[in-house]
Curated annotation (Swiss-Prot):
SUPFAM superfamilies: Ribonuclease H-like
Organism: Leuconostoc mesenteroides subsp. mesenteroides (strain ATCC 8293 / DSM 20343 / BCRC 11652 / CCM 1803 / JCM 6124 / NCDO 523 / NBRC 100496 / NCIMB 8023 / NCTC 12954 / NRRL B-1118 / 37Y)
Family per similarity comment: Belongs to the YqgF nuclease family.
Pfam families referenced in this protein's UniProt entry, alphabetically: RuvX
GO cellular component, one term: cytosol
Location in the cell: Cytoplasm
Keywords tagged on the record: Cytoplasm, Hydrolase, Nuclease, Ribosome biogenesis
Name this polypeptide is given: Putative pre-16S rRNA nuclease
EC number: 3.1.-.-
One Gene Ontology molecular-function label: nuclease activity
GO terms (BP aspect): rRNA 5'-end processing
Organism superkingdom: Bacteria
Length: 143
């Protein structure tokens, strides 16, 4: 049973996947999207769901530091509804506050990756953090 983790932005969706036991998360790829033109990368996401035999999807929920939700949180909730409707998979959310900051810090301090290269992988690593935090706190996602 594998779970996908998503970091949904307005231009990209970072994708990660759990191992079959649901213990660890690893980055998969970054899907290009365009919210303005209603292009949400659903075809590619469907391919990944099939390739990885995913049984559920966890999306990062970008909350403000005061725990309120803004427009990006609403966009994540809408993306989850689209996934449920299109693929019939259960979805859940994981607070993603500071995951991108944490991913950026790791890439700078531990991997010494240049800014240009960081931009190419940051969303995938943020998706990894989102999914790993979910697995550590909640475990398996089922219908």
């Amino acid at each position: 049973m594998r779970i996908l983790g998503l970091d949904v932005g307005s231009r990209t969706v970072g994708v990660s996947v759990s191992d079959p036991m649901g213990w660890t998360a690893q980055g998969v790829e970054i899907i290009r999207i365009n919210e303005d033109e209603k292009e949400f990368g659903i075809d590619r996401l469907g391919e990944i769901i099939k390739e990885k035999n995913a049984t559920g999807v966890v999306l990062g929920l970008p909350k403000n530091m005061n725990n309120s939700e803004g427009p990006r949180a609403e966009a994540s909730r809408n993306y989850a509804k689209l996934i449920e409707k299109t693929f019939g998979l259960p979805t859940d959310f994981q607070d993603e506050r500071l995951t991108t900051v944490e991913a950026e810090r790791m890439l700078i301090e531990e991997a010494n990756i240049s800014r240009k290269k960081r931009k190419k992988v940051i969303d995938k690593i943020a998706a990894e953090f989102i999914l790993q935090n979910y697995l550590d706190s909640k475990g398996k996602l089922t219908k």
